[in-house]
Amino acid sequence: QAVPGSASVTNGRRIFYHSPVAACSSCHRHRGRGNVVGPDLTNVSMQSDRKGLLESLLQPSLVMAPQYRPSMIVLKDGRNLTGIRLRSWVNEVLRDNKGKNRSFSRSDIEIIHELDESFMPNGLVHVLTDRELRDLLAFLEDSDD
């Protein structure tokens, strides 16, 4: 069993929204609260079991949905910008890791590289205690929240 023991949904909610260490809601939404950099985690427990959730927390770059794979844009003026590509047409729109959208003319772009590393750092959960990790997983699995 992934991280066995008792857990508190209430403490998990606090960790998700208010922990400066985990900072989950700085990138993820849950029930309409949080940021829009990474996937909305409202229904994540319907898409994965506890073991899958834990693996995503431990190794976020292992499996990334294509729409959340970061890209690096190199502009002709030498600047490098990293973000999630939102759309590409006449302008390239990139959402940075703070949730800010930036738009660039295709004519200003030298090259676009798709990256293999998620914005979510590997090992982020190692800064949480086992209890905090259980609480966070319980919150993400709770459908009554």
What are the residue ranges of the model-derived segments?
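Generic structural signal for secondary-structure transition and capping sites
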Residues: 21, 62-65, 145
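Gly/Gly-Pro-rich "capping" loops immediately C-terminal to redox-active cysteine motifs
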Residues: 33-59, 64, 69-115
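C-terminal capping alpha-helices of c-type cytochrome domains
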Residues: 1-5, 58, 79-81, 85-91, ...
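Conserved helix-loop functional segments at active or binding sites
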Residues: 1, 18, 29, 59, ...
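The canonical Cys-X-X-Cys-His
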Residues: 12, 20-31, 41, 136-143
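Residue-level signal for short amphipathic helical patches enriched in basic/charged
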Residues: 19-22, 44, 48, 127-131
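Electrostatic cytochrome c docking/interface patches
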Residues: 1-19, 37-39, 49-55, 76-79, ...
